[in-house]
Every structure is written in structure tokens, then in C-alpha cells.
Amino acid sequence: MNGSDSQGAEDSSQEGGGGWQPEAVLVPLFFALIFLVGAVGNALVLAVLLRGGQAVSTTNLFILNLGVADLCFILCCVPFQATIYTLDDWVFGSLLCKAVHFLIFLTMHASSFTLAAVSLDRYLAIRYPLHSRELRTPRNALAAIGLIWGLALLFSGPYLSYYSQSQLANLTVCHPAWSAPRRRAMDLCTFVFSYLLPVLVLSLTYARTLHYLWRTVDPVAAGSGSQRAKRKVTRMIVIVAVLFCLCWMPHHALILCVWFGRFPLTRATYALRILSHLVSYANSCVNPIVYALVSKHFRKGFRKICAGLLRRAPRRASGRVCILAPGNHSGGMLEPESTDLTQVSEAAGPLVPAPALPNCTTLSRTLDPAC
């Protein structure tokens, strides 16, 4: 949890006196829903990608890494954040006080950097489908993932000393141990490197991708099928970009207001803090939902896993049926190498199918200094 948010929560709880606080019940329920949907959904994403060694393309490796970061974020952040609204004391000890916040920021940065890498991968795949093949290899993707986690460790390392357990009045709390100027500088760095810069990269790459898709005209396959494919890719890009920006913008705007503006500690601002937490945390659980809605290959993978689980169930549970769509169900990847979106090759030669913008890419999350 961010230092300013921590103080705000303490002050707000003191305002409530000893009366019943609705957030003590409602907020943990929302967190429980986010936890269940996020844990199950992201675990399912990993299962679909790992089933039969399907994560072999660069995009699938990035999506796999994003799922790992999202799942770790859900497991390491949500349960502890929920206890803030139900327990007066920090009951998990000094070691977890430091470790939990370190893991939170580690997964935040890993998620945001992965999203930026996915956007670059998609831009190269769409804009330079032939020339980027030598660059977009699984080996290079694994190297990029290693770099992502290395940078995440670098930027999250200071949080091992940022928080500490201490006594406040008669309460045991886990709160920032740094001075206000150091916290302000650290929170500003977190905003810049884990939100602002990734958003700029996402905006630039997706804008250029959209521009290329919108302006490129296929003289042969310019019929309704090509237009439908173009609209589908455009819609997917807009969805993932808007989700990321909308889910995290309120939280970071609030943090900036706390440090650089006027943000009085009232019940209304406390409610805004809670809302910003819920919206930002929800981004990690809606990603698998977006995958399922947009990617038919993910849906096929989900059905295949569902069918496999039901086959292992006792026969007396035969009333629970997992219906498979007709056709070939062998596809388990979130992104196949083939696509119905046809592009003009870079050399004004014959038309070649271009790697598709992934039907499974979405923008997570990434970062929450208020955790």
C-alpha cells in the first residue's frame, strides 16, 4: 500500500469510531470476487498455453509471461489488501510486511513491461511480417522476458526497505518507513516507469499499427472479409488499450493529487481510494475474460481442458456436460500462426498472409503503489 493511502485508510478508520463500516464487508467481498476470477482465469490461461507445449511463438511466450505476472499479482496482493479493511492490525509479521510489497511492485513492473513488449511484437508482426521473422524468435522472446524481470527487480528492489512493521498507538501496522520526500520521489518514479512510459509505448505502437492497417489497401482481397478482419483487429486493439488506461489512470491520478495537489482526508476521498484500488485490481482478472471473448483459439483450449476434467469426473456427475464446438479442437494456442487477415507484403510483390495481431493480447496491469 502506498504511504499516503495507508495514512488515509488509518485516518478514515479513526473517523468511523467504533461503528459498523460498510467497506469492512463490501470491499473484501469485491476483493474475493477479483481473487477468484483472477486466479482461476489466469491459471486457465497458463493451462491453455502450456498444454501440449503450445507456447512456442513469440506472442504466446509474452502472453504466458503476462499470465504469470498477473497470477502472482493476484495471489500476492489481493488477499493482503483485503485485510486492511477488516483487521485493525497487521498480523502477518515484519518479514511479510517487506516481502509482500516487494512482490507486489515486482509483478506490477513485470506486467507493464510485458505489455509494452507485446505491443512492439505486434507492431513488428503487422508492419514488417517478413523482415521481422529473424528478430521475432522464441529465443529472443525468452531473452526479452529475462530482461523484463531484471528491470522489474531493479525498480522494485527499493521497496524491500520502503515498508516496515511498527507500533502506532496500540496497533501493529505495516506502513512506509521512508521520509515523505523520499516516498514522493519513489512514487513518482513508479508512476513514470511502470505506467507513463509503458502507456506511451503502447499508444505509439498501437497507433502506428492502426494507421498501417487502416491505410493499407489490398487490391485483391479488399472485400467484406478483409474489412471484417480489419475491424476485428482494430476493435481488439482499442479494447485492450482502453482497459489498461481506464483501470490504472484513476489510481495514478489520485497518487499525484496526494503528493502534488490538494487531497483532503475525508470519507469521500477514502471512498475514491477504495474505488481506485478495486478498478486497478480488476484489470488483472478481466484479462482472461477478454482473451475468451476475443480469441476463438483460447475458447477451444478452454473447452478442451473442460472436457478433459469432466472425463476424469465420476460417471454419476454426468449431468454436468462441457459442450465442444464442432470442428477441430486440437488448437490450444491463444494465437495461431495463420490468420484470415491478409496484408500487402513490404516489397510490392504478391500478397502474403501477415502474422495476425493477437486475438489474445490485452493490457493489464500492471502496477499499484496503493497495494
Curated annotation (Swiss-Prot):
One of its GO terms (molecular function) is neuropeptide binding. Keywords: Cell membrane, Disulfide bond, G-protein coupled receptor, Glycoprotein, Membrane, Receptor, Transducer, Transmembrane, Transmembrane helix. Residues 1-27, 81-98, 162-186, 258-259 are extracellular. The keyword Membrane applies. It is found in: Cell membrane. The keyword Cell membrane applies. It is a multi-pass membrane protein. Belongs to the G-protein coupled receptor 1 family. This is Galanin receptor type 2. It comes from Mus musculus. The lineage of its organism: Eukaryota, Metazoa, Chordata, Craniata, Vertebrata. The gene is Galr2.
